[in-house]
Amino acid sequence: MKQNIVINIEGLTKTYDEFIAVNEISFDVNKGEVFALLGPNGAGKTTTVEIIECLKTPDNGKVEIFGINLKDKNKQKEIKRKIGVMPQNFNAFDWLTVKENLDYFRNLYDSNISVDELIDRIGLVKKTDSMYKTLSGGMKQRVGIAISLINEPELLFLDEPTAGLDPQARRETWNLIKKLKQQGKTIFLTTHYMEEAQELSDRILIIIEGKIVASGSPSELIENYGGNKSIILKNCDRNILEKKNIQYEIDTESQIHIIFDNNDQLFKILAAVTDDPNVEIEIKKPNLDEAFLNLTGRRINDEGLAK
């Protein structure tokens, strides 16, 4: 296995009776990147991650972590020492403070990490002596991430780290994940939030019903599957566009939209309407949500359900 590859998966398959949860998927995760596994609930994300974390045994396929084959049971402890895990539904002790919780888990893992330093790294200094029960959802997620860092792992698994958080807490958690990447962590992220995957990931693997649908960087997926760029014009004199041979589609009496492929076409449109003081302009760029819709024919709601 190449030196910079942390996870190597080839032909991974896992079934439960007649149900195929993971169907012959293959991918690599590189050192130092944020790798997102994206899909709705039931897509096979959790099963895949639990196999990599040595919690489940695959039916078929090769799984190597840090160059160690998971079939070598004697070396699974070595793998576990190098990984940190924050499951979606992690537990901490309600009536212990942040510091007391982290002290407990440090002793449990027999770690030498400084709890005070960890609290500082994770941005919880002001909550050091606050009971876990009193924390906001975003602060509780930070505690979960801190617990996953107790053993100073090289590879960090974050399972739906912002599920249920409000927009501000979600963005604060994103900033923390970016900071962890800057510190050299390899991060394996499972999420059903398109914006989250687009914001954080170096590479994304989209799976549906246990099968890989597409993979690539956010920009590659958007470029290949996101559809056309468009410009929306409100209160525009359509005669101006017609004189310039610019084709448009009517949305409403006061709004039209124009699809364009490149900047030259965009500049032509803008030049035509720029002198009109009444026109309102909005440029719409394709995003990961549109790419996912075009790939799968469905969207994912906030509960992770395909619709």
What would you call each of these model-derived segments?
Residues G61-D72, E78-I79:
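Conserved ABC transporter NBD signature motif
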Residues K229-R299:
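Short, charged/small-residue-rich alpha-helical element at the C-terminal edge
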